[in-house]
C-alpha cells in the first residue's frame, strides 16, 4: 500500500494538469492497483493521502472540493471493489467453483462485530488502533503543533469562520479512517498492527488543515462556500 500511495503521489505531482482533467481515472487506477497488490492491510491510504495532496494542489471552492472528494472516492471504490469482483469471477471460471459465496462469507466475517465468540465494540476497535500512537512524544508534538498554529492564526488574523469553512473538506477526508473502522470492525480489531496506519490519513489531513489555516491570507472573502 505504501508503494502504491507513494507512486500515486509522485505521478500526481509530475502530471498535475493531466490528472486535473482525468481525476476519476487516476483514482480508479489507484483503487484497481490496490485491489491487485494489497492483501487487505491498510488499503485506504492509497485513496486518502493522494486525495489530500490533490486537494492541496487545487484552487477550487469548498463546495467544488466536496464534489471532488465524492467523485474521487467513488472512482477509487469502484476500482477497488470492481477489481476484487473480477478476480472472483475469473477464479470461479477457472476453478469451476462459486467463489462469490466464499467472498460474501468473508466480507460478512470481516465486517462483523464478533471475534472468537466475543462481541466487538466500535470503541474497542478504535482503542486498538489508537494505542500505537499512545506515546508521550506524539502527544507533545501534536499539542505543540496545535498551539503554534492557533498563535500564528490569531497573530495573522486568519482564525475566522470563513477560513475554517474554506478548508473544511480536509476535515472530511480526516474522518475516512474512522468510517472504515466502523464498517470493518472485525478486521480492524484483529489486525490493528496494519490498520492503525490508516490513521496517517487523519494526521496528514489535519496537519494540512492547520498549515493552510495559518497561510490563508490569500483567500478572497467573496469566495463561495
Predicted feature residues:
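Membrane-interface alpha helices of multi-pass inner-membrane proteins
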Residues: 24-45, 50, 69-82
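Juxtamembrane "helix-exit" motif on the non-cytosolic side of transmembrane helices
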Residues: 85-93, 154-158, 179-191
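Membrane-interface helix-loop-helix junctions at transmembrane boundaries of multi-pass membrane enzymes
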Residues: 150-174
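Membrane-embedded alpha-helical segments of multi-pass membrane proteins
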Residues: 1-7, 25, 40-47, 197-206
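Hydrophobic/aromatic-rich transmembrane helices and adjacent perimembrane loops
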Residues: 190-214
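Specific aromatic-rich, kink-prone transmembrane helix
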Residues: 2-17, 27-31, 49-57
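Membrane-lumen/periplasm interface segments of specific transmembrane helices
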Residues: 69-149
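Membrane-interface junctions at the ends of membrane-embedded or membrane-associated helices
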Residues: 13-22, 55-67, 155-161, 210-225
Amino acid at each position: 500500500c505504501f508503494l502504491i500511495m507513494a507512486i500515486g503521489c509522485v505521478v500526481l505531482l509530475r502530471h498535475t494538469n493531466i490528472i486535473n482533467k482525468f481525476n476519476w481515472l487516476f483514482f480508479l487506477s489507484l483503487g484497481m492497483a490496490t485491489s491487485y497488490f494489497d492483501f487487505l492491510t491498510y488499503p485506504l491510504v492509497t485513496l486518502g493521502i493522494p486525495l489530500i495532496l490533490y486537494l492541496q494542489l487545487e484552487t477550487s471552492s469548498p463546495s467544488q472540493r466536496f464534489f471532488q472528494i465524492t467523485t474521487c472516492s467513488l472512482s477509487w471504490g469502484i476500482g477497488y471493489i470492481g477489481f476484487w469482483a473480477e478476480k472472483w469471477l475469473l477464479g470461479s471460471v477457472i476453478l469451476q467453483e462459486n467463489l462469490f459465496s466464499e467472498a460474501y462469507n468473508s466480507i460478512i466475517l470481516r465486517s462483523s462485530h464478533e471475534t472468537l465468540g466475543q462481541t466487538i465494540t466500535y470503541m474497542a476497535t478504535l482503542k486498538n488502533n489508537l494505542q500505537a500512537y499512545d506515546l508521550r512524544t506524539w502527544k507533545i508534538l501534536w499539542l505543540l503543533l496545535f498551539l503554534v498554529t492557533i498563535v500564528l492564526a490569531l497573530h495573522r488574523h486568519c482564525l475566522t469562520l470563513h477560513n475554517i469553512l474554506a478548508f473544511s473538506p480536509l476535515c472530511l477526508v480526516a474522518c475516512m479512517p474512522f468510517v472504515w473502522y466502523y464498517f470493518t470492525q472485525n478486521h480492524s480489531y484483529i489486525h490493528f498492527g496494519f490498520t492503525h496506519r490508516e490513521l496517517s490519513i487523519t494526521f496528514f489531513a489535519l496537519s494540512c488543515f492547520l498549515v493552510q489555516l495559518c497561510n490563508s491570507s490569500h483567500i478572497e472573502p467573496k469566495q463561495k462556500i
